[in-house]
Swiss-Prot record:
The record marks P31, K58, K61 as: Involved in dimerization. GO terms for biological process: angiogenesis; animal organ morphogenesis; antimicrobial humoral immune response mediated by antimicrobial peptide; astrocyte cell migration; cell adhesion; cell surface receptor signaling pathway; cell surface receptor signaling pathway via JAK-STAT; cellular homeostasis. Changing R53L: Loss of activity. This is C-C motif chemokine 2.
Length: 99
């Protein structure tokens, strides 16, 4: 009985401090997507819809994640020429014409 009362008291004290630990900006707790392996094959630009760069210090490698037109995400090495060319192509597609 004494153990149960002590445990209950400890849980109540801990519960008092938990909300303070959870009150953090969402960006701190946001999941980080990392690439651990890169594709060995060149992807046709006709299959690509978009890309994003991964430069987080929490990831072991800098990477580019291409999203295909069928919503598949593929990790690629940003140092490879075909990756840079594909990013340039996608950038040109998304630019709005100047009037």
């Amino acid at each position: 009985m004494k153990v149960s009362a002590a445990l209950l008291c400890l849980l109540l004290i801990a519960a008092t401090f938990i909300p303070q630990g959870l009150a953090q900006p969402d960006a701190i707790n946001a999941p980080v997507t990392c690439c651990y392996n890169f594709t060995n094959r060149k992807i046709s630009v006709q299959r690509l819809a978009s890309y994003r760069r991964i430069t987080s210090s929490k990831c072991p490698k800098e990477a580019v994640i291409f999203k295909t037109i069928v919503a598949k995400e593929i990790c690629a090495d940003p140092k490879q020429k075909w990756v840079q060319d594909s990013m340039d192509h996608l950038d040109k597609q998304t630019q709005t014409p100047k009037t």
